[in-house]
Amino acid sequence: MPNDRVAPLPPNFVYSPHDKFYYAPATCNSMHYTTASYISAFIEFLVMGTGAICFYVMSHKSDSIGKWLFYIQAGITVLSLLTSALMAFGLWKENPQMLGSKLKFIEFIICFLLIWAVISIVCMAFGIQFTRQVFGIFGKVHRIEQDYGPIWPFNIAVVSFFTAAIAIWTRIIIQGAADYLYDKAYFADKQNVELRESSKTR
């Protein structure tokens, strides 16, 4: 049977919370995971807020979609803000478990957007009549066609894929920040590891 135990660290090992290992590859290694997490959460909120504004215009101004869609999007935006606030508090307190709600929220958003994109593509493949039947639940398809052209389901798919890509990028960064906090807590408890703090800005 192979030995599954992790090899002990060398006696002269020096841990640094500012090691290049903790600079996010998703930012071309230009930012520490903690800094990148704040920025990615802010970008996520901007995207969600922009979506809420667009849904408000479409539901309350042009009346092309149901008003309930705007309220759902507004609720998602509020959840984004709340989970980001909890994440920021967790980073401040150096508690990686408090980042869990943000990661779960992002996973839900990714799944929802990918499903929405697939539905849009399938509707385009089956023709305009099928598209009108499916999307008629959400709004006035004829009005949407007048405002956004005949290939509007393609636009929905593109926006969904683009937003999902941003969410995946955000999740990678925040997961890296959580791993960083777990590492920091682990090495802080090791008696044979020198925890080297730096005054360098994260």
From Swiss-Prot:
Its main location: membrane. Residues 59-68, 129-148 are extracellular. It is found in: Cell membrane; Cytoplasm. Interacts with vps-39. Residues 1-37, 90-107, 170-202 are cytoplasmic. The chain crosses the membrane at residues 38-58, 69-89, 108-128, 149-169. GO terms for cellular component: cytoplasm; plasma membrane. Keywords: Cell membrane, Cytoplasm, Membrane, Transmembrane, Transmembrane helix. Involved in cuticle formation and ensures cuticle shedding during larval development. Plays a role in maintaining the hypodermis. In association with vps-39, may play a role in vesicle tethering. This is Protein cuti-1. Disruption phenotype: RNAi-mediated knockdown results in a squat body statue referred to as a dumpy phenotype, uncoordinated movements, and while animals can move in a sinusoidal manner, they cannot progress forward or backward, (referred to as a skiddy phenotype). Animals also display cuticle formation defects where the cuticle blisters at the point where the outer layers dissociate from the body, and furthermore the cuticle fails to shed and wraps tightly around the body. In 10% of animals, the cuticle tapers in the posterior region of the body. It comes from Caenorhabditis elegans. It is a multi-pass membrane protein.
